[in-house]
Each structure stands twice: as structure tokens, then as C-alpha cells.
């Protein structure tokens, strides 16, 4: 059975059984009909994924892996803040009339800073360090720029990555301030797992662990029945994953270089309402 499924089920059970409900509290998020979107939450969730053991895609329901990877590349590779550069409609609600989400996500990745080795952006700094000083304890990114928050369509949810090399393994910690568990949990796990694999390949390393730290892991009130049904579904082995081995430059990767095989999964859950 998929380890990712087991972690997801355990997390959801913990939230539903011991989580804190925001009912009666003032909340920002709203459903499309204007109703307050309340949640049940757990503070400080930590899930560990061994990327050598399996590729952590859920089998409880399908994850659109290529679409998730495209969003990750939109941020990390294309460093774009315009949804016209994205092959999906995930960000439509947060974009302005020109398609911009402001100074968020990809915009922050493209900002250049003066590092000891020269002027470059955060992504290039990570790649440079992994190639030249892989055992450094300072290999990280952070896109939660307080100065620019007022100009962001959405403040970053997944906001920092810390990379750590142990032997020949590239490990990473993904820090997330908030997560809609049903809509986004496996989406984020999949895309950052692929990122670790890609960075490992272009720097001569092997993918190790992805540790996902979520400050506020929550299930929305209208998602509770969906989650309760979903976690009772049968679980299947994780799909097989590989990257095109010919790619040696991070900026040459496309979604076509991500190969997923034997992905056995349950039916998709359609028309999931999203709180905004």
C-alpha cells in the first residue's frame, strides 16, 4: 500500500477526531455563495516521505501530477507571476484582469540578491550551492517577503524550502503556513517531491527525504463528508516515477520529462468546492 495514502488517512483522522473547529469564530475565507468557510484544524503537522522508497502520489483519488508539476515549474523555473504562463486555471480567482497575481510566488523566485558567489536569484543560488558547497547548512529559499505582501494576490502558503545533503542524498523540508488538506495536500507533496528529484538529478545527487511541515492543516466544513468517504477507500501501491535521464539542466525540464507508470487509483472526486 502507498505510504502517502497511510500518512494522509492518519492526518485526516487526527484532524477530524482531535482538531479545533472555527465554528463561532470570525473567519476570512468564504464559499462562493458568501457563507463563511469554517474549518477543523490541527496545528503543527509533520509528514515524512522517503523518495527512494516510493513516489508519494495518493491512490485514494487521482492527483493530476503533470498539472501539479507545471505549476511548480511556473514558480521555480519560469519564475512567473502571470497565469497566462500556466497551463491550468488553479490561480484564476487570485489574478487581476491582466492575469497577474502580483509580487507572489514566481515573482519572488526571480528577484536577484547579492550572494558571496555573485548576484543571482534564489533558485540559481540553491543550484550553485548544491553543486559547489553541497554540505552547507544554508541552502534554502523563502518567498514570504513582508515588504511585498500587500502587492500579492495571495500570500504564499508553501513559503520556504530548506535543502540538506546527507551523503549522496538530497533532502528537503517544505514549510507551509496553511493548507486546505483535501484540495492541496497531495498536490503540494507531489510537486515538491518532483522538485527534489529534479534538483538532485542536475546536481549529481539522489533524492532523499521530503519533510512536509504544515502549521495549520485544516479540513473545510463542506469537505468533511468527502474526506470521510475518501479515507475509507481501498489503497493501492504507489505509482512508479522516473525523470528523463538526459536532462542535465534544471531549466530544460518540462512536464514531458516526468514519467509516471502503473498509477492505480480510485475514481476522481468531482466538483470540490474551494474556499477563497
Q: What name fits each language-model region?
A:
Residues 1-276:
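Terminal, non-catalytic protein-protein interaction segments that mediate quaternary/complex assembly
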